């Protein structure tokens, strides 16, 4: 039962982590793009 609970937590955290990394990379890319201009 605990294993299923941990598995659910991991499955819930993975998309959040990927989204956070994507947003951070996108904001850094936008900032670098503006600096070039």
From Swiss-Prot:
Q: Where in the cell is it found?
A: Plastid, Chloroplast thylakoid membrane
Belongs to which family?
Answer: Belongs to the PetG family.
Q: Its topology with respect to the membrane?
A: Single-pass membrane protein
Official protein name in the record:
Cytochrome b6-f complex subunit 5
The regions listed as transmembrane in this protein's record are 5-25
Q: What's the superkingdom here? A: Eukaryota
Q: Name one molecular function that GO assigns to this entry.
A: electron transporter, transferring electrons within cytochrome b6/f complex of photosystem II activity
Q: Which UniProt keywords apply?
A: Chloroplast, Electron transport, Membrane, Photosynthesis, Plastid, Thylakoid, Transmembrane, Transmembrane helix, Transport
- Spell out the InterPro entries in the cross-references: Cyt_6/f_cplx_su5, Cyt_6/f_cplx_su5_sf
- What organism is this sequence from? Phalaenopsis aphrodite subsp. formosana (Moth orchid)
GO cellular component, alphabetical, reads: chloroplast thylakoid membrane; cytochrome b6f complex
Where mainly located?
plastid
Q: How does it assemble?
A: The 4 large subunits of the cytochrome b6-f complex are cytochrome b6, subunit IV (17 kDa polypeptide, PetD), cytochrome f and the Rieske protein, while the 4 small subunits are PetG, PetL, PetM and PetN. The complex functions as a dimer.
Question: What the protein does?
Answer: Component of the cytochrome b6-f complex, which mediates electron transfer between photosystem II (PSII) and photosystem I (PSI), cyclic electron flow around PSI, and state transitions. PetG is required for either the stability or assembly of the cytochrome b6-f complex.
List GO BP terms, alphabetically.
cytochrome complex assembly; photosynthesis
